[in-house]
Amino acid sequence: MAAKDVKFGNDARIKMLRGVNILADAVKVTLGPKGRNVVLDKSFGSPTITKDGVSVAREIELEDKFENMGAQMVKEVASKANDAAGDGTTTATVLAQSIITEGLKAVAAGMNPMDLKRGIDKAVIAAVEELKKLSVPCSDSKAIAQVGTISANSDSTVGELIAQAMEKVGKEGVITVEEGSGLQDELDVVEGMQFDRGYLSPYFINKPETGSIELESPFILLADKKISNIREMLPVLEAVAKAGKPLLIIAEDVEGEALATLVVNTMRGIVKVAAVKAPGFGDRRKAMLQDIATLTAGTVISEEIGLELEKTTLEDLGQAKRVVINKDTTIIIDGVGDEAAIQGRVAQIRQQIEDATSDYDKEKLQERVAKLAGGVAVIKVGAATEVEMKEKKARVEDALHATRAAVEEGVVAGGGVALIRAAHAIAGLKGDNEDQNVGIKVALRAMESPLRQIVVNAGEEASVIANKVKAGEGSFGYNAYTEEYGDMIAMGILDPTKVTRSALQYAASIAGLMITTECMVTDLPRDDKGADMGAGGMGGMGGMM
């Protein structure tokens, strides 16, 4: 086991604080509308330019092991805030730095660290309650666009795009961000249920100019099995041909004789058919087939529940207004499913989301909800160069997380004002002893730090502006972008309550632990030179063979 380097008391805390400051100083230059970019060197490819706090934090590793421990703990603050709300990472880092700096000063002055931590925790619990009182619901497109704009570094086109996307697919809909091919940002909305499976044979194509298949008012056969024998399909095909409608077959697979016969029938115009594989694998495939069945008012033909293909009738088939199939995707538009049944299915999947433990499962279930409930919107980010594209895509993703958080828990006045109002409301809070009172003061002072940092980044005098904002009431604050005072909510400067709350809670949680640190232990650096000499001495062993 390697020898350890151990530091105690003030020595340990000074080292830790130095690491905290290096990381926080690198992150906090990005805060606010006039925050700057940080350039990150990559071991391969071109450097990345970012204004995203958590991206900067993740890149920082320090040479000194004790300083690095301090930096890594603050990195954890940024990561936790990012995981919880998807934004607010820089705010969380600034809050943590302030609590740690002020807290360690109090420890050096002889206060009890445990009571300081209790005081900080009391203040944060009270402040979170105040934030909830200050919060207003975020329901209309205008507010959503404003939240998106602020989070995307005052880029109003991004805010507008996100608001449009949410309007089209609903607040629960899936919105994804992709790299576009042009210079302009674009919004693509896929109405209806889309899944990533294309046609099984190009001979089904009936729109050669687009290389796709379009079926108007088709019947939809859903089979949870491989279909290779045409005989078991004949009754259904005959019934569909009599009805004079096209047929879409969604099955585990359609192969061999069955596929060949379907192709021949289609080419001769006897019956218009298209076949695609069912989406997903294993249990997820069964669930998605059931989703399609609910959407189209059909029945999944599965031997598990005693249904056979030979005995399938038109009543078992689903229906939709239109189906479009190309090489890679199938879109079912306007299924005839009963609205109540669809909502019931959505509620069932939502319950599974609550119970899901892995992020991957949650994401897949969320996609299923969106496909049933509204549709999928894709924001395609446009830029002139790859470096700009990556930076912009990261900003759009941040803005999207922020708007989702705003819809979830509402919004408060932005620009650090909400924290100042919350701090003012709990200024009379008292702890059980004097040390706890100092802890409360540390937290209250820290709650001013995001506003101060926004002002510093805008090149103004922090104390003057902070005092003027503190003297105001409600959502009165300072707009660093236009350099004027006013009602932040009226000016459209909004922060999601969830983002502000998460930033404060995670910053206080980790900063409180760091204040109570009395000893730090790390591995001593190994003397590689000595190790090499030892290994070199073994060279003579070869002669022993």
Swiss-Prot record:
InterPro entries per the UniProt record, alphabetical = Chaperonin_Cpn60_CS (IPR018370), Cpn60/GroEL (IPR001844), Cpn60/GroEL/TCP-1 (IPR002423), GroEL-like_apical_dom_sf (IPR027409), GROEL-like_equatorial_sf (IPR027413), TCP-1-like_intermed_sf (IPR027410)
GO molecular function of the protein, one example?
A: ATP-dependent protein folding chaperone
Query: Where along the chain is ATP bound?
Result: T30, L31, G32, P33, K51, D87, G88, T89, T90, T91, G415, D495
* Taxonomy, superkingdom: Bacteria
Subcellular location per the Swiss-Prot or TrEMBL entry: Cytoplasm
Instruction: Give the UniProt record's GO annotations in the biological process aspect.
Output: protein refolding
Which family does the similarity line name?
Belongs to the chaperonin (HSP60) family.
- Official protein name in the record: Chaperonin GroEL
- State the organism of origin: Yersinia pestis bv. Antiqua (strain Antiqua)
Q: What is the lineage of its organism?
A: Bacteria, Pseudomonadati, Pseudomonadota, Gammaproteobacteria, Enterobacterales
Gene this chain is encoded by: groEL
